A protein has these predicted regions:
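Acidic, metal/ion-coordinating pockets
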Residues: 1-176, 180
Length: 182
């Protein structure tokens, strides 16, 4: 699978990574859209995004009180749909914490259309819930917590259109290896 991030660009707006990818499973096409929090500048290692003089040389579409992020995500979703995606799964590192506003997964969903599922991270939360998109449609949002405590499973029933999510505790997924004790 490719690394995807619709909102990671250089300062001229040129994408650093592909924003989306469409994969085919039988006769169903699924578009995957990558989204990273603009908080990456401050919550990771800032020097990764700076030149030798300390000037930022990248953007995460952080401007206009969230609108820049919503717009670039919408463009990637629309492009995936134009390529024939039957479903769009957003892969986000946005989170739901209030201090991450206006870039939370909830806000991205509320300001876009066309996303069916958003698999999220960043806030290390554990949940599966629905949020309304800009058109008032339900979008499943799920997070699996932190440090591989859980594995997430999302199922799209292509006959009914129902989308479900399940959390599975990692400890329940594999027996301990006798040789390593892990």
């Amino acid at each position: 699978y490719a690394y995807l991030c619709a909102n990671f660009t250089d300062l001229e707006g040129k994408a650093v990574l592909d924003g989306y990818q469409v994969l085919t499973y039988g006769d169903v096409k699924v578009g995957y859209v990558g989204i990273d929090t603009p908080e990456s500048f401050t919550k990771s290692t800032p020097t990764y995004f700076q030149d030798a003089a300390g000037n930022y040389i990248y953007s995460f579409s952080q401007g206009n009180e969230g609108k820049d992020l919503y717009d670039v995500v919408q463009k990637a979703v629309d492009a995936a749909k134009a390529e024939g995606a039957d479903y769009v799964v957003a892969l986000g590192h946005l989170g739901v914490d209030e201090q991450s506003s206006p870039w939370t997964s909830t806000e991205v969903i509320a300001n876009t259309t066309g996303i069916d599922v958003l698999i999220d991270g960043h806030s290390h939360s554990t949940f599966a819930k629905t949020e309304k998109n800009q058109a008032g449609e339900d979008v499943l949002v799920a997070q699996t917590g932190t440090k591989l405590a859980n594995l997430g499973k999302v199922v799209i029933d292509t006959k009914t259109g129902e989308i479900t999510s399940e959390l599975v505790a990692a400890k329940d997924c594999a027996a301990e290896d006798e040789a390593t004790g892990a």
